[in-house]
Regions:
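Compositionally biased terminal segments of proteins
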Residues: 1-185
Length: 185
């Protein structure tokens, strides 16, 4: 079954691994930072399907982020890879996700054969979604909170560590609180 990014057609772990293998072959790199929602497919054994609706894996080579453009061109959106498999890589950079300054201290390392995936922990990933603040991010954060995969107190602490103005941090924290309220049954 192809992953199309539609509810009920979630990107599976083997598809994430496929994208990583293809990215490694294209970039001649073996270590990648993953920053998008599909990180949950590597961090949680049986994640709620609502968290896996994206058909893209946001990543960049950890040692040579500039090679993300090669990945994007070869297996990105609208590529033959995407047309064939229904999912794709989104070659991004270190600046793409707004993460706490110390996120790497908590990063989860996932070894997939010869490939290393460096993933923000779930709270740091949720913080990046709070900072982005799009409707799809609201849905994502609500599910994390609803299913007790993250907690609001830790989110608030991590938001305070963002390299943003105090005003921006306050807006992001308020946004997270609203998602927590919405997540309550």
């Amino acid at each position: 079954m192809l992953c199309t990014g539609l509810p009920g057609l979630e990107m599976q772990r083997h598809e994430i691994e496929h994208v990583l293998r293809a990215a490694a072959a294209i970039s001649n790199e073996t270590s990648f930072v993953l920053v998008g929602s599909q990180v949950v497919g590597l961090l949680i054994d049986s994640p709620p399907g609502e968290l896996l609706v994206s058909a893209e894996l946001d990543l960049y080579p950890s040692l040579h982020p500039e090679k993300a453009d090669l990945i994007d061109g070869a297996i990105g959106a609208l590529s033959t890879f995407h047309d064939t498999f229904g999912y794709h890589a989104d070659g991004v950079g270190p600046e793409t996700a707004t993460l706490p300054s110390d996120w790497m201290q908590r990063a989860k390392i996932v070894y997939l054969g010869d490939i290393t995936a460096i993933c923000p922990d779930l709270h740091d990933l949720a913080v990046s979604k709070c900072a982005a603040g799009r409707p799809k991010d609201a849905d994502f954060v609500r599910v994390l909170l609803r299913d007790h995969l993250v907690d609001l107190e830790t989110l608030q602490q991590r938001i305070a560590k963002l390299s943003v103005t105090a005003g921006a941090a306050s807006v992001i924290a308020d946004w997270a609180r609203r998602r927590a309220t919405e997540a309550r049954p």
